[in-house]
Amino acid sequence: MNFTIPAPFTAIHTIFDVAFTTGLDSMLETIQEAVSAPLIACVTLWIIVQGILVIRGEVDTRSGITRVITVTIVVALIVGQANYQDYVVSIFEKTVPIFVQQFSVTGLPLQTVPAQLDTIFAVTQAVFQKIASEIGPMNDQDILAFQGAQWVLYGTLWSAFGVYDAVGILTKVLLAIGPLILVGYIFDRTRDIAAKWIGQLITIGLLLLLLNLVATIVILTEATALTLMLGVITFAGTTAAKIIGLYELDMFFLTGDALIVALPAIAGNIGGSYWSGATQSASSLYRRFAQVERG
């Protein structure tokens, strides 16, 4: 049997990466163009009002200047496409992955995960097809057991790949809506939304670090042990023994898969994005800075 897609994981990763990159880059430009003019007008008016209040003594001079500087920096990031790309997008799409790669235990680049999964898929499929040819068409029990073992293996590979691929896609999605979210940082009532957005980006960065540490070890271990396990299965005496060996192979992959699937929850707890108290901490920190400025 010839596969329609020789390297399915690499192909799917490339297709989704190109689709989301193209679509979200276009959406980012549209968002920045839409908010640019009204935001600049509103901020200009706000700065004028802030200046009047400072002159009249209704707002502390140091506090007023600090607010104007903060708002100016945020607006520059939102309306300036080059600024947003250089200081926000490049940090989470380039700087963070390069930094995370330095902590690799195996030396296996995280970007090669789809290719590694393709190799595992191709090698196991060859053995599965060989065993399938040994099962008689009337042997329903062996057919059912064989199909179960095959689907379990598919599930473990695809779930691990899904966690890996979701990191890159969700990073692009969060960065694409960034200008809209950062507008909320200007206003006191919506500042917590921007804090949560930053928290989610930090969480994804932590998840990328955990994947680089755990997923690369798991996949490299699976690829190393796979040849030996498939050799034992292939030379088993009976077809039934080979099918049992396939389930033992599934158990091995399920163990590694459980480690990878648990990583998003671990990253979320470390990053604090799942904690209801996270935004309260951000607000409390902001109030402390405000008190220092007034003092």
Curated annotation (Swiss-Prot):
GO terms for cellular component: membrane. It is a multi-pass membrane protein. The keyword GTP-binding does not apply. It is found in: Membrane. GO terms for biological process: protein secretion by the type IV secretion system. The chain crosses the membrane at residues 35-55, 68-88, 167-187, 201-221, 226-246, 251-271. Keywords: Crown gall tumor, Membrane, Plasmid, Transmembrane, Transmembrane helix. Belongs to the TrbL/VirB6 family. This is Protein VirB6. It comes from Rhizobium radiobacter (Agrobacterium tumefaciens).
